[in-house]
């Protein structure tokens, strides 16, 4: 009987040990990242007599930069409580000032232009947009937004919400650049910018390139039907260390390139139309140019 008790105790200990071992072998749960709280870039009261609502442009950093930006629209009441919007629009503008004839500018508006941006779209309870700011705020011009929205069937407007666009601090994205395509004497300006990855690594990276046609000062549709060949070379060299074909998908021209190590690289682009015919970028003087983005990480 005593022997049986010893066997039973040993068996229970083995089961307990095995159970603990099984629990220890289970992978630890992957922590779910907490979304970053939005930070206000700029805010102002609505234009109605009562100044009923405060309108805020927000993102995760609290700063707009020259280049591609995600943004959110928030509207709060006098108590600071966010209100539900039934509809909303966002249009960015830049006032360009007249020159003073001495290399500077005077605070008199010469003309106003917009920039590439997407219509506000509701995701859950958040209204979101993306904008490509092609210039930074400076002596030559300032940015502002016109915003409309509807609450409980009533429409409100904010004709001018001033905000600042700062220089792009992320060298991994390079800068916004432009080129022209000529048909006769009239040139059609285009903008292009690398929008991803924001944090490249040594090895393979998926890149995303945006190209926009400047139809006029208000309209900047994306070019979606080209093919872009990209060649990656190290600074000071023209030898290709990686090449890829970028095709339009998920909002941008995408493909994968390889960086052998952290450093400074030039991404040179060759453009082709839908029929495979070369598209030759030119400058304002109709001279053929090469287009590229220089990055560093």
What are these regions (language model features)?
Residues 65-81, 190-193, 201-217:
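Beta-strand-rich structural segments
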């Amino acid at each position: 009987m005593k022997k049986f008790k010893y066997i039973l105790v040993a068996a229970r200990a083995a089961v307990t040990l095995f159970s603990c071992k099984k629990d220890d072998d289970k992978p630890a749960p992957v922590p779910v990242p907490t979304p970053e709280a939005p930070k206000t870039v700029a805010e102002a009261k609505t234009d109605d007599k009562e100044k009923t609502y405060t309108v805020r442009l927000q993102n995760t950093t609290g700063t707009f930069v020259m280049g591609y930006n995600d943004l959110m629209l928030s509207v709060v009441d006098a108590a600071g409580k966010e209100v539900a919007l039934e509809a909303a629009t966002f249009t960015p503008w830049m006032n360009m000032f007249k020159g003073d004839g001495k290399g500077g500018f005077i605070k008199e508006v010469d003309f106003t232009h917009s920039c590439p941006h997407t219509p506000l779209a509701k995701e859950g309870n958040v209204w979101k947009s993306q904008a490509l700011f092609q210039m930074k705020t400076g002596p030559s011009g300032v940015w502002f937004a016109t915003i409309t929205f509807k609450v409980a069937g009533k429409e409100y407007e904010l004709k001018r919400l001033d905000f600042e666009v700062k220089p792009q601090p992320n060298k991994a994205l390079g800068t916004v650049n432009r080129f022209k395509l000529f048909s006769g004497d009239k040139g059609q300006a285009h903008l292009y910018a690398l929008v991803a990855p924001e944090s490249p690594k040594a090895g393979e990276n998926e890149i995303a390139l945006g190209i926009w046609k400047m139809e006029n000062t208000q309209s900047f549709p994306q070019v979606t039907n080209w093919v872009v060949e990209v060649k990656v070379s190290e600074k000071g060299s023209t030898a290709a260390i990686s090449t890829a074909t970028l095709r339009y998908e998920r909002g941008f021209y995408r493909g994968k390139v390889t960086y052998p190590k952290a450093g400074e690289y030039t991404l040179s682009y060759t453009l082709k139309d839908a029929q495979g015919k070369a598209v030759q970028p030119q400058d304002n003087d109709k001279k053929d140019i090469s287009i590229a983005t220089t990055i560093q990480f």
